[in-house]
Regions:
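Sec-dependent bacterial lipoprotein signal peptides
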Residues: 1-19
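Metal-centered catalytic cores of metalloenzymes
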Residues: 2, 19-84, 88-149
Length: 149
């Protein structure tokens, strides 16, 4: 048996193993979850409840993996943010904090290892979570966006 004939079964097994690893739920590609639901967001003052007159804006995305892990961030312009959170609440409703975001300059990110509980996972999938950025002038939030996967 030649070396090439001996190598073919080994190469085939390695290729099959790689395919299985790539298809596993919750695997990551480039730091993002390869399965789950993603919500892209555009934050404005008009989305706040009550609405806020501001020129500040923000954008970003959040991804929920099938195991409840959540990742994502928003980047803002025109606001001196003091805090940002993912909150529970349908459009036009205010609610409690589900996840606090960490600030780095004008970017607010979900902390590593953050997970949503089952109720918050269902709320995410139903569009009943929102992200907002608070400021000294608008303690309840200056800009907001609904998470709509």
């Amino acid at each position: 048996m030649t070396l090439v004939k001996k190598a073919i079964p080994v190469i085939a097994l390695v290729a099959l193993a790689a395919c299985q690893t790539m298809s596993d739920a919750g695997s990551t590609v480039g730091g993002w979850f390869s399965s789950g639901k993603t919500a892209n967001v555009k934050l404005t003052g008009a989305e706040q409840n009550p609405p806020v007159a501001t020129s500040a804006t923000g954008s970003g995305s959040f991804t929920l993996a099938t195991d409840g892990a959540v990742k994502g961030s928003v980047t803002t312009t025109g606001v001196q943010g003091t805090a940002a959170h993912i909150h529970r609440g349908a459009k036009g409703q205010n609610g409690g904090v589900a996840v606090g975001l960490t600030k780095n300059g004008d970017t607010y990110s979900v902390p590593d290892g953050a997970k949503l509980n089952e109720a918050d996972q269902a709320a995410f999938k139903a569009g009943n979570l929102y992200v907002n950025v608070h400021s000294a002038a608008n303690k309840g939030g200056e800009i907001r966006a609904q998470l709509l996967p």
